[in-house]
Curated annotation (Swiss-Prot):
GO CC terms: cytoplasm; nucleus
Protein species of origin: Cynara cardunculus
Protein's recorded name: Protein CYPRO4
Gene responsible for this protein: CYPRO4
The family this protein is said to belong to: Belongs to the VID27 family.
InterPro entries: CYPRO4_DUF7135, Quino_amine_DH_bsu, Vid27, VID27_C, WD40/YVTN_repeat-like_dom_sf
Disulfide bonds: none
Lineage: superkingdom: Eukaryota
Length: 501
């Protein structure tokens, strides 16, 4: 919607523009459209009373963004971000320089596990390809670790022998010398009954762990590290698990604190050290952790919940949904910003608030009160949305990767079809940004870089921030994986020279 032009663009078997001659006609259309959208999503008339019922009285800024307090969006800005040389050109792509593109090994690529140290890993259903990390990206065909578990089954299959189900999650841990592989127990379902522990150095699956609570087998749909940087800890023995109605921490040591003797055990059991099994209806979908171990969880109903480091039982803050399921979440290292992915847009949430003593805190530490900033939406333009195709959906929205306190994330990236879409974080946070002028409703940002491949992209993610420090770029390289190729791009500062291989 372009208020200054009294124009509405939309997609329906093509891209169309609806132009209004009078300002009042345009505004009436926008108001009626938003009311109809609310009624279609929630099945309620778009009255103020029903909006408060849906969003809650503390989220009045989400209902009426024009009265929301936007000051928190620029609360933590500093001069580094305000420098014009650090700003991303609008919708430009000439400052993304392709460094390396390599074909995958036999078996292709199903997922990528980026390391912050020397290596990263390309995962498929038969093994893991080890590649080298450089300041200009990842490349080089190193050791290929073929899954070998000594005859044990792989990844939660209930039948004997190897599972033919591709690992849906690969999680690095213990100083990136080990990898946990989680595969669905049944085709078409995300739930797994356990994980396999791969020793990368020996190339062996050393243990198949079972998920169990109170003597009963249970499932998990996702796993992640305890904190943003805990995969670098060589002594790491715990990780987090998520299921539709469960949030938990798992420990690979026994209850007495001793490492389990797994040599004579067919199915060692992971210990549920803390967590909560919720009543049905939470429908958790994805989760992520901050630098201190606080947890953000996205749900099927669109809600995003924040849990502190001290309790997984009750969320400190629960942001309402906007009508679309959250399929993926990420959070900045400091916990100030949360990114949720839906099929058609990304939602960026500011978790900062001022408590009664005037101190600035995040929603992970306490109740945010009723002055909660309105979120911002990141969307494709109608033309790009049409080009992406009606069946292609956003997935895997992430911040650039920071694992140290005091560092700042600079970009956001998500994948849709053959597109990798990159937003400048500071531009999105800037309330005076040109995208937001004359907009009605929640602020939506359409300024991004668009990278295109010749096949659907599996994942788009930035390498660890330390690889920005050793190169010519202000940002670590972007890695894009398709089923057949892995490509690295450098974010040029105008001085770097690009290479094509």
């Amino acid at each position: 919607m372009f208020g200054d032009q009294r124009r509405v663009d939309f997609v329906d078997s093509g891209v169309w523009a609806l132009k209004f001659m009078r300002d009042e006609d345009y505004r009436e259309f926008v108001t009626r459209f938003q009311s109809c959208l609310f009624e279609n999503v929630y099945g309620l008339k778009a009255s103020d009373e029903n909006k408060v019922k849906v969003y809650g009285k503390d989220f009045i800024g989400w209902v009426k963004p024009d009265v929301a307090d936007d000051s928190m969006w620029e609360k933590d800005d500093d001069e580094l971000w305000r420098s014009p040389s650090k700003m991303t050109p609008v919708r430009g792509s000439n400052d993304l320089l392709e460094e390396f593109e390599e074909a995958a090994s036999d078996g292709g690529i199903q997922s990528v596990a980026l390391g912050a140290l020397d290596n990263s890993f390309l995962v498929n259903d038969s093994g893991v390809q080890v590649v080298k990390n450089f300041s200009h990206g990842i490349h080089g065909k190193g050791v290929y670790v073929k899954f070998d578990n000594g005859g044990k089954r792989v990844g939660g299959s209930s039948s004997g022998g190897y599972s033919n189900l591709t690992p849906q999650k690969a999680l690095l841990m213990r100083g990136e010398t080990n990898m946990l592989l989680m595969s669905p127990a049944k085709a078409g379902k995300p739930h797994s009954t356990g994980v396999n522990q791969l020793d990368i150095e020996t190339g062996k699956i050393v243990t198949e762990w079972k998920f169990e609570k109170d003597g009963t087998d249970i499932t998990m749909r996702d796993i992640t590290n305890d904190t943003k940087g805990s995969q670098l800890d060589p002594s790491e023995s715990t990780f987090l698990g998520l299921d539709d109605n469960r949030l938990s921490q798992w420990d690979m040591r026994d209850r007495r604190g001793m490492v389990q003797n797994i040599a004579h055990s067919d199915s060692p059991v992971l210990h549920w050290t803390q967590g909560h099994q919720f009543s049905r209806g939470t429908n958790f979908q994805s989760f992520a952790t901050t630098g201190d171990g606080s947890i953000v969880v996205g749900s099927l109903d669109g809600k995003i919940r924040l849990y502190s480091t001290t309790s997984m039982r009750m969320a400190k803050t629960a942001f309402p949904g906007l009508g679309s399921p959250i399929t993926h979440v990420d959070v900045t290292y400091d916990g100030k910003w949360i990114l949720g992915t839906t099929d058609t847009y990304l939602i960026l949430i500011c978790s900062l608030f001022t408590d009664k003593d005037g101190k600035t805190k995040t929603g992970f530490s306490g109740r945010m009160g009723n002055k909660i900033p309105a979120p911002r939406l990141l969307k494709l333009t109608p033309v790009d949305s049409h080009t992406a195709g009606v069946n292609n959906k956003f997935h895997g929205g992430r911040f650039s990767w920071v694992t140290e306190s005091g560092k700042q994330e600079r970009h956001l990236v998500a994948t849709v079809g053959k597109f990798s879409v990159i937003w400048d974080f500071q531009r999105v946070k800037n309330s005076g940004h040109e995208c937001y002028r004359n907009q009605e409703g929640l602020k939506s940002c359409y300024c991004y870089k668009l990278m295109t491949k010749d096949e659907s992209i599996i994942e788009s993610l930035f390498m660890n921030d330390k690889y920005a420090a050793v190169g010519d770029s202000p940002e670590a390289p972007l890695v894009m994986a398709t089923p057949k190729k892995i490509t690295s791009f450098s974010m040029s500062d105008g001085k770097a020279k690009g290479k094509r291989r």
